[in-house]
């Protein structure tokens, strides 16, 4: 694997070039929980050294849900580009990234490989606008959430806020000539809008879908089960991995 240096964000929002692969040699979950490592370290661990519940080192690739040589990969919530780098090292022929938040997008531009395309948009059910916030500090790189999700989650210290353009999920599928094989989604609570709106034809065109789900409201589990049933009806197999108290979970879907 290419030992690529990555542009990351410090707690204060400064861009810092780091060797996340080398830092990972000393990484531990206990150390992360104690503050010895930050969200950038955890993201590298999650993409390259996870190995939990039969994944192949990446939480988004498990059982039959994995990137094949030549795949076109759609990365929704690309952040600074660690998963996109993973996809390229796995042999993807093209990686299409969407990331709405300016500080992380600026790092993504610098980190992207030759096979990666980047777009500064949020992704939703249809075109529009929303406000995205980063809370706590800039190493909280999973914290770029829409204003609506912030209201649903909790009152946190907002350190960055910006209005962003939303592009509809079906427009993405219709806007690229290349067939998308693998879709990864980590959009911090926006998955309900996207997965409710995506057409059966576009879902069915995928071989794999891997998504991080966030339980942001009481009836979320009902939505999740309906979506699982929908995917099963389209011929997908699936696996759900719950974390901690169960509010955060990873769902892997694949066709054999």
Question: Where in the sequence are the language-model features?
Answer:
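Phosphate/nucleotide-binding beta-alpha loop and adjacent structural elements of enzyme active sites
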Residues: 1-256
């Amino acid at each position: 694997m290419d030992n690529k240096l990555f542009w990351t964000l410090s707690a204060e929002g400064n861009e810092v070039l780091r060797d996340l692969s080398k830092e990972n040699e000393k990484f531990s979950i206990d150390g992360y929980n104690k503050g010895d490592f930050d969200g950038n370290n955890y993201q590298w661990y999650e993409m390259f050294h996870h190995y939990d519940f039969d994944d192949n080192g990446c939480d988004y690739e498990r059982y039959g849900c994995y990137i094949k040589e030549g795949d076109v990969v759609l990365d929704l919530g690309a952040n600074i580009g660690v998963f996109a780098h993973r996809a390229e090292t796995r042999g993807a022929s093209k990686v299409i990234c969407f990331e709405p938040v300016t500080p992380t997008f600026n790092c993504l531009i610098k980190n992207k490989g030759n096979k990666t395309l980047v777009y500064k948009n949020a992704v939703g059910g249809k075109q529009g606008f929303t406000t995205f916030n980063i809370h706590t500090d800039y190493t909280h790189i999973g914290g770029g959430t829409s204003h609506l999700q912030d209201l649903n989650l909790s009152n946190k210290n907002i350190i960055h806020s910006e209005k962003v353009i939303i592009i509809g999920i079906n427009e993405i599928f219709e806007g690229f000539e290349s067939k998308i094989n693998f879709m990864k989604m980590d959009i911090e609570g926006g998955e309900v809008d996207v997965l409710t709106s995506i057409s059966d034809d576009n879902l069915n065109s995928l071989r794999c879908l891997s998504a991080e789900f966030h339980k942001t409201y009481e009836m979320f589990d009902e939505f999740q089960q309906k979506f699982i049933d929908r995917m099963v009806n389209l011929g997908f197999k699936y696996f759900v991995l719950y974390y901690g108290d169960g509010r955060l979970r990873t769902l892997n879907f694949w066709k054999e």
